[in-house]
Amino acid sequence: MSSGLYSTEKRDFDTTLDLTQIRPYGDTMNDGKVQMSFTLPVACNEKGIEAALQLARKMGFVNPAVAFSEALDKEFSFYVVYGATSFSVDYTAIKVQALEIDTMDMHECEKYIEENFGREVVMVGASTGTDAHTVGIDAIMNMKGYAGHYGLERYKGVRAYNLGSQVPNEEFIKKAIELKADALLVSQTVTQKDVHIENLTNLVELLEAEGLRDKIILIAGGARITNDLAKELGYDAGFGPGKYADDVATFILKEMVQRGMNK
């Protein structure tokens, strides 16, 4: 079921790119076109479609249209809405704590360890708290890695331990002490109701209570993890989508050398 996707109304846009006023791009610069999807707790019918349109208008959409709607069951429906927004942001004023590292591949990391470390580097990773997902930590830790990027278990000079999922923070720290970890890698996939914020904060507090926080490299990762967020929560770095084991390894190794932790 769809509704009114196309309009014959002529619209003119300033097609000049202005980084102080950037808008979403559909097929014309500054047209502000946006696609959004959501679920409503109502039946999929004409009334449900109108509810979706009214919500889109209240969100600032101009001339919204329901491109797709589908019943999930008798009392829930799914919608894809197209529209345009007149809002813009000043791209030049945005400040972020982006990780600026010259990523080394696996072989370069191994050579870096050989030249700068007199021992193996111990990296311990897990999905901690109640998070039962391992896809993120496996992509970084497991030998086969992900998307052509081998995991830390394959790196010569690295002793990598993947503790899996649903590891209590207390057990994670206990294992880190036992293994004499240089770096802890925490993956958080479940983020509903900001449960990941609470769990990540709890880990930092426990490490500080044990007097370990300044003695290790602490990394957070996940689909909704940014470096800004990780730093704010007390981590050394955060890695989100599109990052691989070589990115993580490069940061850890160079940070250890900078802190004099490589002896």
Curated annotation (Swiss-Prot):
Gene Ontology biological-process entries: L-lysine catabolic process to acetate
Enzyme class: isomerase
Sites of N6-(pyridoxal phosphate)lysine modification: 144
InterPro entries per record: Cobalamin-bd, Cobalamin-bd_sf, KamE_N, KamE_N_sf
Pathway assigned to this chain's UniProt record: Amino-acid degradation; L-lysine degradation via acetate pathway
Domain of life: Bacteria
Assembly behavior: Heterotetramer of 2 alpha and 2 beta subunits.
Family: Belongs to the KamE family.
The protein, known as: Lysine 5,6-aminomutase beta subunit
